[in-house]
C-alpha cells in the first residue's frame, strides 16, 4: 500500500509542472480567441451599422487593462449631441499580459491605440492605410510561453505559437 502511495506521489510531483504549463497555455489561447472574437464582432457591426466601430484598450492604451468594442461619435464629422455605444467590454487579463508594452495597433497619424473598422469592414488608419500588425501574449507564471495574434492586411486573424511554427510567425 505504501509503495502505491509513493508511486502516485512521485507521478504527481513529476507531472505537476507540465500540467501548470498546459493550463497557462489554455488561458493564453482563451484570451487570444476572445480578442479575435471581439474583433470579428466589431468588424461585423461596422458592416451592419454602416458606420465605424472601434476595438480599443480600455485604460491608457494598455491592452492588459482590457478592451472595449464601441461605435458612434467617430470620424471627422461628429456632432455635439452624439452618443457613443459600448457593445462589449473585457476586463483585466491577469495573469496574461501583452508583451512589448502592448504598443501595437497605434494609428501613426492620430496616435490612438486600437483597431478602427470602417463602414466597409476594413481595418484602416485615419489616412486610409490598411492596418496589419500583431499583439504578443505572455503568461506571468510561465515566461517562456508566448502566442502571437497577427492581423494580416486582408483582415484575417491568426494565432501563432513561435515555439512550434517560427516561420509562420514572421
Question: How would you label these PLM feature ranges?
Answer:
Residues 41:
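Internal catalytic or translocation cores that form aromatic/hydrophobic pockets or channels
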Residues 2, 10, 14-36, 44, ...:
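N-terminal helix-rich module
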